[in-house]
Amino acid sequence: MKLNNYQFILISLTFIHTFLLAESKVSSSLPLAQAVENVYPAIVRIEVVSEQGSGGRMMKSRSTGSGVIVSKDGQVVTNHHVAGKATRITCRLHDGEEVLADLLGADPMTDLAVLILRMKDRAPDSRPLTIANFGNSDQVEIGDVCFAMGSPAGLSQSVTRGIISNVALISPNSGSFRLDGENVGELVRWLGHDAIIFPGNSGGPLVDEKGFIIGINEVGIGSLGGAIPSNLADQVSQELAQNGMIARSWTGLECQPVLDPKEDGLLVAGIIKDSPAEKAGIKPGDIIKKYDGKKVMARIAEDLPVFNQLVYGMKVGKKIKISGLSKEKKMIWTLTTSSRESAFTKESELKSWGLTIRNFTLMSSLEARRSDKEGAQVHSVGRGGASYSAKPNLIPGDVITSIGGNPVKAVNDMVRITNIIIKGKEEPVPTLVSFERDLAQLLTVVKIGPESVENRPVQAWKPWLGVSTQVLTRELTESLNLPKSTKGVRIAEVFPRTPAEKAGIQAGDLLFRIDGQVIQAYRSEDAEVFGNMIKEYKPGSLALFSGLRHNKTLDLNVTLEKRPEPANELPNYEEETFEFTVRELSFGDRVNQRLQEKEPGLIIENVEPAGWASLAGLRQGDLILKVNGKTLSKVELFEWEMNRLIKDKSKQIVFFVKRGIHTLFLELEPDWDDTQ
């Protein structure tokens, strides 16, 4: 069969199209393979224990994020919001190996942090680290293929593919993304992309087709992701690794885009009081056209981070020549940059006050409209604590200026004075405190020091029968075909090894009288009547209990015994380092948990929600069977063992606990620098 020209052309085009599709599929898989091969083994999953002030105390929390190894000695780049407040860091490598890491430095202004793996802790036969290299983010263009890598939701490493959709993405609302008081958008213009970003991907690399890092993923909003450009990330991470911090200059200039889009330069929106810019004579409304000889311009908000990078990147103490316009007149200003302080200092906890507090920085003192940086600023207040209970009570933002007549210029003054006041005291000490709230100068009295010892009621001398009961209400007596005038109780449970069990009382027995005296219980609110009647006897007394069993008369003589010590009278121990409390097992604990009389264990009475014990997984009600393999059934032995472990700074404390019908091992790995 001969083909006409039209058929031949059609078949040829179809063949070419099929060939191109096949070639496209092959070629499209190559970038992914290369990117994965180059970078995937360098991805780490980061498990972090962080600490920050809230509710009057330093709260610990667990979180996960991602990072990427960038050096042979184990430097890992991630986000500040992942690890910037870390007290303990564990990195899981692509092959499952777990390595502890330390924080070298963190920068909230760019949301970047650098970790260093504890390489000496790795096994001698461990594989060499795979490292990823930074590319040039200035060469990235809209439409470029990219790969977002990380460990979403704390799972294993993953890769998603997308394209670059924006090379100068900023937050639509100025100052909407803040870390430690710093506006991240002041310096960062994200690379926008549509590679899917899941929770936990933060800190992972954004990679190009050649396998180079072009960004560090930071945010995911719907289907849009944002990555910190690699050029900025590389520069900041190198300085963090070397110095542990970023040194930036400060001028007091606050600029915005020009109002007239046809005009060059930037508009001065404001000048901070007493700043280098104010001293140079720059005023709001002036136009800046050149900064240190470099032409500057901002017609839209996306242009501002470029200018801010230039300003903050100058050496501290450098003389800067600025040219521009002031009221349409050409001007040249000269200023000397000063060192930029962080927006806030790290908060500290004062347990005896129920507060977290912090020092002022230059900017935080200016924001608070203070003339200097003296005083200790209240960061958070715990409900029920000493500061919350004072009248007037302290609130966040208050500035403590003196304690007991002693001036407070900084947090360390407050700590020192407090230690002097409470030293050797066993009760809270009412202390006069001077503080400022806005423009008001106030006084209050705060009772600081150890908590008052509770006056626990003594019950151990009282007798008991060893049963639980329910009142014979009118409804019950009618259902049991008893006379309507019947009063008494029904035995719901007989506890083991008790006077009731020894005397032969059984569950289901109906009791109407004790030694001939009617048990005046016939309403739900009469639940205490039976117990109160027994309390009238002395331990060792013989009492006759009369009633019915299976519709037959029942009379049983019972020798009442001393009531076992209730839970609130048993020895307990509050472990302050790891923040949990244990006590010895009560009779009720053994009954409820079906434990034998001599079965060892200590019950956890309380676990602070932010302590190391909580992070290890201990829960209120857990039964501690062993600590590091040792059985400890007495509180004094437990206290001695815990003090020994703390003194030795044990790297690992393993609790073998019983939870319901299950047993499990819980591992506590303290960060001793943090707990001391």
Predicted regions, residues:
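Bacterial N-terminal signal peptides that target proteins for export
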Residues: 1-9
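Bacterial N-terminal signal peptides
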Residues: 9-18
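Serine-dependent protease modules
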Residues: 22-264, 269-280, 290-319, 326-363, ...
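Short, conserved beta-strand segments of beta-strand-rich sandwich/propeller modules, principally
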Residues: 319-321, 430-432, 542-544, 652-654
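C-terminal accessory/binding modules appended to enzymatic or scaffolding proteins
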Residues: 358-386, 580-615, 619-624
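C-terminal soluble interaction/assembly domains
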Residues: 605-653
